[in-house]
Amino acid sequence: MCRIAGALRTLLPLLAALLQASVEASGEIALCKTGFPEDVYSAVLSKDVHEGQPLLNVKFSNCNGKRKVQYESSEPADFKVDEDGMVYAVRSFPLSSEHAKFLIYAQDKETQEKWQVAVKLSLKPTLTEESVKESAEVEEIVFPRQFSKHSGHLQRQKRDWVIPPINLPENSRGPFPQELVRIRSDRDKNLSLRYSVTGPGADQPPTGIFIINPISGQLSVTKPLDREQIARFHLRAHAVDINGNQVENPIDIVINVIDMNDNRPEFLHQVWNGTVPEGSKPGTYVMTVTAIDADDPNALNGMLRYRIVSQAPSTPSPNMFTINNETGDIITVAAGLDREKVQQYTLIIQATDMEGNPTYGLSNTATAVITVTDVNDNPPEFTAMTFYGEVPENRVDIIVANLTVTDKDQPHTPAWNAVYRISGGDPTGRFAIQTDPNSNDGLVTVVKPIDFETNRMFVLTVAAENQVPLAKGIQHPPQSTATVSVTVIDVNENPYFAPNPKIIRQEEGLHAGTMLTTFTAQDPDRYMQQNIRYTKLSDPANWLKIDPVNGQITTIAVLDRESPNVKNNIYNATFLASDNGIPPMSGTGTLQIYLLDINDNAPQVLPQEAETCETPDPNSINITALDYDIDPNAGPFAFDLPLSPVTIKRNWTITRLNGDFAQLNLKIKFLEAGIYEVPIIITDSGNPPKSNISILRVKVCQCDSNGDCTDVDRIVGAGLGTGAIIAILLCIIILLILVLMFVVWMKRRDKERQAKQLLIDPEDDVRDNILKYDEEGGGEEDQDYDLSQLQQPDTVEPDAIKPVGIRRMDERPIHAEPQYPVRSAAPHPGDIGDFINEGLKAADNDPTAPPYDSLLVFDYEGSGSTAGSLSSLNSSSSGGEQDYDYLNDWGPRFKKLADMYGGGDD
């Protein structure tokens, strides 16, 4: 009985919640009021409130679902409100009277409209072990035990019982924590036990949803549950003693969240697009719309039903479509869909849960746009029964007439595009009709020339169709056929020769003035009185003339079949015929003269030059004949030698091989090398035959054993012509002139060099040499030198020191050079001598100085040097007074030096 009572207590909240949801849904449909549905929200809490602990959930009624509401707390330091209305603790604090009441505000983000509701928190009474023992109204779950078969005492059973799941409705309004069940062990009479639960929702994320009193074992839920987030919780209950030792095996507790109708259906698309052909029969499928509901699909809360709320436009019937209330398939239910009248329908589709219950179910809407597609239910119709046009004769690819049609189908579709055909009046296919892709007009075009003299008018029967056949039951009206009357305009046409070309046969050799034929043209314009005149357009050999009035053709020169203007025995001449119409027209005709051959060309020998040996053997000359005539005025030919001069037949003999070839051989045993002209008589087979004496130029030469001319004979025989000799002489003369000019230039250069030479011996002229000497430091070996040549600066007269400027050393001065006195020798230059002696002594005593006493090698200065070696150079102490007069003979470049050291009293 206790368990039954507990089960009833569990079901009562569920039934109450269902009843409350039904009432709320009914009230919402009847009259929805935006704001908080409750005046005061209350919750029962423990004394200690922890940071982040969910306290309660406040609901806000948003009737149209479009408001965006923001929540605020009047005590923001202690409480905060999430977007879903869940109230959390901002910090940890003990619950007291000052926290018992506060306000929650809801404000519309767009309109700034504001609502408020009061929240009341009450302190849950503290449970003691005595109060727990006295509490017997809450359903208990006892850890299972059973009797032993042997002892009859209570023992643990080997297998746990299966605890029935706890059903808890979602969105419960509390107060929280809400007691669910009490877990108890029958060993609590002897031991002090502590109870705990583990699993998702307790100590695993999301934590804190379920809590248990460790002393009483009371299991509670701390906040409203949401089945759409978690539909089932699986917890495990544990019982331990005060030392933490396990007293009972853990038992499984399953908590099922009972679904509430708290979610409206949502369409996958807010706007659905579909098409249906016009003229569709009832029952034609159009499209499918789909909505989903987050509630339990196996319960009424998630079972959706569809219906059409409205249709726009409502023609021809307000109920043109219907929808399957379970699948969302939209089909046609009425006939009369006509795209030309209504091109698009807009349906408002509603999806309602609770199997479409309008009282308790939640609804949502979407839009279905149905486009009526075109079919070929309107044939093209001509705007007129007869169309007119005209065309000049002999003109093609011109538009004669425009055929216009109307079609009510959708433009630029196969059901609208027109196709024209000619059904009568054009047996020879001279006309065609093309469709203008933009205007859909038919363009009647002439494709073959029309002769006015043959047909002056055409009456065409044309029909218009579409690219696709008409829909079933639609027939072509009479307006789909029309007549086109085409008038042909006469124009001046070109005269024409008949036949063209005209062929005549004539023998060559006709004399000038011979009338060959009459070549006339015809005027196709029979209804115009016009005259034709003739002129010659092309006559390559200028053999013909034509009468401008009657067209008679006469020769003005002898016709020759062998002329280069004759190809394959045919001579072509072109003539022009012109009328006097407006505008004047002309035509050309070709006269082909087939020339018959006569024997008017004598044969000639081929080749005209040949070679043979001085002896008859082993060579012979093969010859043939060239005749510009053709059979029978050509071969076979007869070959013979003339009687004079007598040396021809004495030296040569000719043998006829066949009708075209003969062989020429030496008759005598030896003929001196040279060039001989042998006349040969050749006669053709014409009637009468024609003969000719042709000269064969034969070169007789010395031959080798093979019968070939030797190279010596070829070179001698070749010789040099006058032009070659003149060219060789000119080359020799030019070469001699170049050599002579080179010799003259060399002579002139030598003279210039001699004019520039100095008066001194060339061997002593070393002015142009820049001599580099090796290192000569360390002092001279020859220290016996005359220091009298060194002059102190104070011995020079002040007047002699004058600035003369800077000039080139090879420049000849144009004014008198200053004269300097001859330096007097200083007999005892003590200062310079002491300086040199001190330096010499220091060098001799320096142990780090290099051994300059060794043999020193100097560069060779050439044979032009006055001193053959350095040892032959004279110093100031080697002799008496030095003679520097020879410096005056060295030219202007040494004049400065000669003036300084030359003899002179001053």
UniProtKB/Swiss-Prot annotation:
InterPro entries: Cadherin, Cadherin-like_dom, Cadherin-like_sf, Cadherin_CS, Cadherin_pro_dom, Cadherin_Y-type_LIR, Catenin-bd_sf
Positions on the Cytoplasmic side per record topology: 746-906
Positions of Ca(2+) 1 binding: E170, D226, E228, D262
Key word Membrane present: yes
Domain Cadherin stretches: 160-267, 268-382, 383-497, 498-603, 604-714
Keywords associated with the record: Calcium, Cardiomyopathy, Cell adhesion, Cell junction, Cell membrane, Cleavage on pair of basic residues, Disease variant, Glycoprotein, Intellectual disability, Membrane, Metal-binding, Phosphoprotein, Repeat, Signal, Transmembrane, Transmembrane helix
Mutagenesis / variant outcome for changing D597N: In ACOGS; decreased function in cell-cell adhesion
Subcellular location(s) of the protein: Cell membrane; Cell membrane, Sarcolemma; Cell junction; Cell surface
Binding sites annotated in the UniProt record for Ca(2+) 2: E170, E228, D259, M260, D262, D295
Name of the protein described by the UniProt record: Cadherin-2
Organism: Homo sapiens
Gene (UniProt): CDH2
